[in-house]
Amino acid sequence: VRAAAAQGCRVLVSTDHLTLPASMDPRCECQVPARDLPAHQAAFDAARELAAEIAPDMDFIFGFECDWYPGCEHNVAKWAQNAQVKLGSVPWIGAAGDISIAAGEHGCDRIDPADAPGLAAGWIDYSEDMHIWEELGANGVWRAYVDAWCAACESPLAFDSMAHPDLPMRFSQDGWSAPTNVESLWDEMAACAHDTNRRIELSTASLRKGLPDYYPATGLLERFFKAGVSITIGSDAHIASDICFGILEAQKHAFAAGYR
């Protein structure tokens, strides 16, 4: 909150990663565990009081980044019921296994991991475990990702914006280049976002990951514009120093793509 106030931020949305099933994140490494949801809400409420004191003109909004996976609708509705903003994201591809028990809950130790090698499922943005890339190759990951992303757009979940739409670009500078037919995949994504009336996020996080372009890449952003898809702009900050990172430049970039 203090960092956002210092940057002159007008709208700050808290979007920590929502609770996940034990099958996907058994060690609770990338989520707010179900047991911690009340404490997380309390921490936000305390921060909102601070925001009202030091930045009364800033809108501070409670939300979550909600990972889409097959069958997630009930879980997301339950765990994100207090969220004013829900970012939709697709960092996982493939089946998610038994999603009935949240990570850290009683009985979670009996749940088999859904990302075991050979299952063609797992996280596509986790640099410490690249087995899904090694199993499917870049072409396979991209194909599965676009299918999953479109399924997320088509889901009944009320995602307010689809975060970092071309997330597989994450490792494009590390030997996993986008496939030669990526433009046809972009066409699919733009058409799907239009047909499902979804917004997409223009994210500056990619620049902090060493990529030469934003999420989404310029070619995809231009397709979203031509398809009449609205955008939000965010920094996806995980630490205070990244709050509002590159936002003004991203606004200019969106303007160059046609957005007003």
Identify the residue ranges that each predicted region occupies.
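An N-terminally biased module of ancient metal coordination in phosphate/nucleic-acid-related enzymes
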Residues: V1-P70, N75, F171-Q173, S177-T180, ...
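Active-site neighborhood of phospho(di)ester-bond hydrolases with catalytic His/Asp-centered motifs
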Residues: V11-D16, I61-E65, L87-V90, D160-A163, ...
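A structural motif
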Residues: C9, A83, L157-F159, V229, ...
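Extended substrate/RNA-proximal surfaces in nucleic-acid metabolism proteins
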Residues: R35-D195
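Short hydrophobic "helix-edge" motifs at membrane interfaces and signal-peptide entry regions
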Residues: A6, E154-S155, F225-G228
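Charged catalytic cores and adjacent phosphate/nucleic-acid-binding surfaces used
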Residues: R2, S172-R260
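Feature marks short, surface-exposed loop/turn motifs that line or immediately flank catalytic pockets
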Residues: L18-P21, G94-A96, M169-F171, S206-R208
